[in-house]
Amino acid sequence: MTAHARARRCPLFAETFDKAASTDDRSVSRPRAALHRAAPALALFAAARLTGMVVVALWAWHIGRSPRALLATSWDSKWYVGIAANGYGRTVYWPDGAVQSDLAFFPLYPGLIRAVTSVVPVTGGTAGLVLSWVAAGAAAWGVYAVVERLHGRRLATLTVLLWGLLPHAVVLSMAYTEPLLTAFAAWSLYALVTGRWLWAGALAGLAGLTRPNGIAVAAAVCAVAGCELWRRRGTKGGRAAVWAAAALAPAGWLGYVLWVGARKGDVLGGYFAVQSGWTSRFDLGLGSLKVIRSMVTAPTFFGFPMALVIAGVGVLLFALFVLDRPPLALLVYTGVLVLITVGGSGFFESKPRFLLPAFPLLLPLAAALTRARPRAAITVIAALAGLSFCYGTYLTVAPTAL
């Protein structure tokens, strides 16, 4: 019985594969061979995102806007560039009493922007764009690697293409943190399903320094590590790396949250107070229900009902994903992302963006397309492309946050 077969029969421990894998499995660890296999998927992803950027550029020129400004300095991008240039310390006080601090933004991405601008003569916005594009490519490769490992090349290629054609996929071409988080998450999950514990923990730690919902990666690593330690109870060898991964995984997220708390004078609650200033808190979806009710009773911007539809589809896909009995690592990672998105309040229109790193949600759709007739599959992909390019362009100029 192959390692893949054992994983499917025992999904709880699907992340741990037999070290005596086949030659084809071992070749996955060879970067050149792995990149060669992923090349068609990466080419499709690049084509999708380049087309999306061309559409954004054409519309920007049509309305007298700068394409670069839309992609590099919109909404959150301005905050990241500001942190990169001046460090933390900016606070905005609004007439309604809201207090928004730049401490809500995690440090790794602006730190990388600062590193690039210190050695290359480019602006922070340009550096942020380049970093996002590189991270998006690395993320697409990581998504391919995970899905290929579990389901084969055809499904992996379709998943990468679908990820590049999501309604909010324009964010993957902007100076935002979702590409970087997804890159760390995908490769951490790949390290988990191939038994590379230290890599899994280290990458999860970096994910936790990238975005608040990066804690989902740490949750996956710790859950799998806990199961592995339970499986190895009573044995003496091979446990140190598992413990190390479990310790490394949440270190980035916890370190930043505690640092913000110390800076605000409340070690445990300071960071969450900062998030409250942005109306972001976990309230089990009560805030979202209020927004949905207001959409029924009063006019609203187009992005709000679209966010509701996309988030609803995401929840449905998660249910289908769970029914397929996925590996524990993917189940926990995706479940935590969905829980944070659905249960959090604030910035309702941004919920689809928060789900962008949850690429395993696309597995049920990709599997359905592999079983569909070619004409039907092409029609679905073309429709998704049209929606992605048009809605993505709208998002870059919309009066509401991405």
Q: Where do the protein language model's features map onto the residues?
A:
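Loop-to-helix entry region of an early transmembrane alpha helix in multi-pass inner-membrane enzymes
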Residues: 107, 111, 119-138, 302-308
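Membrane-interface alpha helices of multi-pass inner-membrane proteins
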Residues: 164, 185-190, 198-225, 248-251, ...
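Membrane-lumen/periplasm interface segments of specific transmembrane helices
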Residues: 48-63, 67, 72, 218-231, ...
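Short acidic/glycine- and proline-prone juxtamembrane loop motifs at membrane-interface regions
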Residues: 174-180, 351-352
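Signature aromatic-anchored transmembrane alpha helix within multi-pass, membrane-resident enzymes
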Residues: 246-250, 371-401
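Transmembrane-helix signature of polytopic, membrane-embedded enzymes
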Residues: 123-127, 143-165, 332
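Short hydrophobic/aromatic helix or loop-helix immediately within or flanking a transmembrane segment
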Residues: 75-89, 98-121, 285-289
